[in-house]
Amino acid sequence: MRRPLLGLLAALVVVGAIAGALAWLLNDPKPPTGANHAERLYYAYCVTCHGVDGRGSWRAALFLIRPGELPSAARSRPERYLFDIIKHGGAPLGRPGMPAFGYHLSDADIEALVVYLKTLDRRPAR
């Protein structure tokens, strides 16, 4: 009688650990309080792959994807290039392609995101 209870207890611990890990993995970062429209867009559409600071996220790494480092890309690329990559997607420098967001975001939203991306290199890494 004791052995089946021990097995059941062990199974419950394993299931609880897996559920806790999944809850942690699936918890998306939230924008800071008082975030402007562009920052909220970044958190809604970009942070999963590019991370909070724009330097990539562990979620993308799980799928062996290395998204571009946004602070240096935003600093070195023209705004039109960034706009086009966000709107139409693409595979710059032979990397896996970024999906197109032109169907989800208006041109004004994409322009606001581009302006926000230009501020990432001035933010401390988190």
Descriptions of predicted regions:
Residues P31-T33, R55-G56, T119-R126:
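Inter-heme linker and motif-flanking segments adjacent to c-type heme-binding CXXCH motifs
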Residues G16-Y43:
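Electrostatic cytochrome c docking/interface patches
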Residues M1-V14:
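N-terminal Sec-pathway targeting helices
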Residues E39, G51-D84, F101-Y103:
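Gly/Gly-Pro-rich "capping" loops immediately C-terminal to redox-active cysteine motifs
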Residues L62-E69, H88-L120, A125-R126:
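Axial heme c-ligation environment in periplasmic c-type cytochrome domains
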